[in-house]
C-alpha cells in the first residue's frame, strides 16, 4: 500500500558450504569482549549487532505526528480484507490456492530475502535466487529492501530504545502497526541514517528495486494477484480483489508484524533473559520460521534464525533446498557449543537444549 512510503519524509563457484560459528574459547577474551560481540565472527557486517552503549536521551518523547494517509489506507485495506474473509466460501478453489501460494512466496521475500539475506547477510545467494527473492519481496510490499533492511538493522542495534523503529516498550499496537502510522522518532532517523548501508548501495538489484518500487508494487502486490484468478479461471472480480489481494496482503502484513509485537511480549527467553524478544512458536507458524526471536536476537548472524533449523521453520528448509541446487551458499550456523554456553550464561532456564 503506497501509504507505507509516507511514514518518513523521503530525502564464482557453485559449491554450497555451511559456516559454523563458534564461541571464542579463551576465558580472558570473554572477560574483555562485550557480550554482544563475543560470538559474532562476521568481519564484513556489524550493523545488526546490539549496541548496549546507546541510551535514550532524558526528557519526554516528542509528540506523535500522525500520517493520516497511512491510517486511512490501512483501515481501508483491513476492511477490504474482512470482506474478503466473507467471500472465501464463495471463491473458487483455484483462487484460494493462488492466494496461499502468493502468501508463501511473499513471506519468503521477507524471511529468506530482505531479512536473512539482505539485512543480516547470514548466507549468500546466486543471481537467480536474488532475482526471485527481490520479486517475492516486492509482492509482499513492506517497503523496499534498502529501507526495510536499514530499519531492521536499527531495530537490532538499538533494540528497545527510541532509535528502534518499532520499540516494543511503546505497547503492542505501536510495535505491531502503529509505528507505520506516525512519523519516525527523531532518534530513528538520526541513528538509522548513520548505519553503514554500503553493501546494499553497491548491490544493483536492490537499488533497481528501490528506484522502480512504486510501479513494481502496484503490479506485483495488487494488479497481478487480482488479474490472474479473474482472467484465467473466471473468478468474480470482487473475489479476486478482496480475497487474493486484500485478504492475502493483510495476512502477510500481520504475520510479519507479529514478530515485532507478539514475539517481543509473549514467550520464553531461553537464550538471553536480559532482552525482550521471545520464542513464540505461533508466530513462527504464521511467518514460516521467524518467531524464534530470542534466539535470533542472541545470534542474528545464524541463517536459520533458530537453534533447530527445520522445526516450524519453512524458510530454513527453503534456503537449504536452494543450497542443494547451488543457488545459496556460505550459510552461517552457530555451533552447539556456543548456543549451550549462551544458554548457561544468560538464559532464563526454560531451554531443554542439550
From Swiss-Prot:
Its main location: endoplasmic reticulum. Expected to bind 2 Fe(2+) ions per subunit. Substrate binds at residues 70, 143, 150-151, 183-184, 257. Residues 1-28 are annotated as: Disordered. One of its GO terms (biological process) is unsaturated fatty acid biosynthetic process. It is an enzyme of class 1 (oxidoreductase). Fe cation 2 binds at residues 155, 264, 293, 297. It is a multi-pass membrane protein. Residues 89-92, 233-236 are lumenal. Its EC number is 1.14.19.1. Belongs to the fatty acid desaturase type 1 family. This is Stearoyl-CoA desaturase. The gene is SCD.
